[in-house]
């Protein structure tokens, strides 16, 4: 029985590790697909895609998975037509939520998204109901180090709009059109880039209590479990 118990624990640990790896792979795939949609499928001319591929390789994602993600985002999978759809609505506590999807079946996707909102006490809205609370920006997160002055200078000189300083990271914001050139500039300046993407940023964040925050996080988790969902944005602090 001791051996059985030990194996049960090993299986449990392996299941947790597999789940963790699955989430890491899912994020890597989404980062690649977002980069392709924003800047095209060529990593030689799309710095965000090149970095997303490097991050995917760093977590041991197979090359076939990387290629499939690029082909899916660029519409090159044979016999399948994907389209981009954005859903918007309110989560618990009136938190505004935007859900970017890439799907080959709109009916399936909207049913899944609506179910997640309803189950979490939120409501799926109509087009334009919350999108006015967000603006599209390039966001580059880099690690702070002794080279940060040169990194900030490179970012600003290449067109960055703002740099937010936190304890361990710098968050560089750009116009979408300037994103790639700023990304390349800070990379050349020696920045260790942790995340980089063009996405939606809330223009005004709202405070919610801990219980509401947990409900919103559960809604986001439910949405992100859907393979059709590419990105989820919200205005919760």
From Swiss-Prot:
Compartments where found: Cytoplasm
Protein name, entry field: Probable transcriptional regulatory protein NIS_0560
Assigned protein family: Belongs to the TACO1 family.
Superkingdom of the organism of origin: Bacteria
One GO molecular-function entry: DNA binding
Record GO biological process: regulation of DNA-templated transcription
Keywords, sorted A to Z: Cytoplasm, DNA-binding, Transcription, Transcription regulation
One of the record's GO cellular component terms: cytosol
């Amino acid at each position: 029985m001791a051996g059985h118990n030990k194996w049960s624990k090993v299986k449990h640990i392996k299941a947790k590790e597999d789940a963790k790896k699955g989430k890491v792979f899912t994020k890597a795939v989404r980062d690649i697909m977002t980069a392709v949609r924003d800047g095209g499928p060529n990593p030689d001319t799309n710095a965000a895609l090149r970095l997303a591929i490097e991050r995917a390789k760093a977590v041991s994602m197979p090359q076939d998975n990387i290629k499939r993600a690029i082909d899916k985002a660029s519409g090159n999978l044979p016999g399948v037509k994907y389209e981009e759809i954005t859903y918007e609505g309110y989560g618990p506590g009136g938190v505004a939520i935007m859900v970017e999807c890439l799907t080959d079946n709109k009916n399936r996707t909207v049913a899944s998204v609506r179910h997640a909102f309803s189950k979490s006490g939120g409501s799926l809205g109509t087009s334009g109901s919350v999108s006015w609370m967000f603006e599209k920006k390039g966001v580059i997160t880099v690690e702070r180090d002794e080279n940060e002055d040169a990194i900030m200078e490179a970012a600003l000189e290449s067109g960055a709009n703002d740099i937010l300083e936190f304890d361990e990271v710098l968050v560089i914001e750009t116009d979408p059109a300037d994103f790639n050139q700023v990304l390349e500039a800070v990379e050349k300046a020696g920045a260790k880039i942790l995340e980089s993407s063009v996405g939606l940023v809330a223009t005004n964040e709202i405070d919610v209590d801990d219980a509401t925050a947990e409900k919103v996080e559960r809604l986001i988790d439910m949405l992100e479990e859907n393979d059709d969902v590419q990105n989820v944005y919200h205005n919760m602090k």
